[in-house]
Amino acid sequence: MTILLDRKTAVLVQGITGKIGSFHAKEMMDYGTNVVGGVTPGKGGTSEHGVPVFDTMKEAVEKTGATASIVFVPPPFAADSIMEAADAGIRTCVAITDGIPAQDMIKVKRYMRRYRAENRMCLIGPNCAGIISPSKALLGIMPGNIYLSGHVGIVGRSGTLGYEAAAQMKELGIGVSTSVGIGGDPINGSSFKDILELFEADPETHAVVMIGEIGGPQEAEAAEYIRDHMKKPVIAYVAGLSAPKGRKMGHAGAIISAFGESASEKVEILREVGVAIAPTPAEIGITAQRVLKAA
């Protein structure tokens, strides 16, 4: 079993006729993802990589029965695309787009609260790598060849550090159930806590690797959830131990602005609740191996 995505999940690509959307749609299809169509306003009635293109998400969902979508839409229009997906009945939406204005994401978050919690779309991102369930399906931009199918979940703000963790674990023969990149923006759809809840409920996930970074309260909130609810072992790496306060480091959300937002403070908070800490990026894999052997 995987979380959020399996080989049967019917996927729509929003922005499929653009250069980036078209490229990654093909990559996902080649990996085995069940891409059933795409959406580009004004391009309805055409096709891309053998799947139909629709003008609206509503029409696309009605015609294909899709339950998931991925957004490759320029920043000025991405928020509208996310809200359109929610209104069309999409259950899981991955927003790859980087540079969506914070004000637009506040609008998206407020808009999605109109729906009851049980009917609310799960938004992953924006500015994220997406989701991969190895050997089953890819809903994102990850390099599928570095993932081995297995029983360790990965969740991280940094896509590339998620790749690094997966590659190290593959070399050690440790497989991944699902990997989720939640994105590095200060306002995003799903938090560490949201994804940890899904992994804790998944019988095929035996442990979780969590990759955090400086800035924001997400790691502290995750630590509280781990302390109170998680029975599965958690391994963590927090990027930015040498980052100076007040300077943005890569992601828009990677900036230390308050107590508890530095990497060292986050490491201490996580260690206090029993999380195994990888001291460097190069040691994520061996830390996971050590924890799994002890479990």
Residue positions per predicted region:
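Catalytic-core regions of core metabolic enzymes
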Residues: 1-295
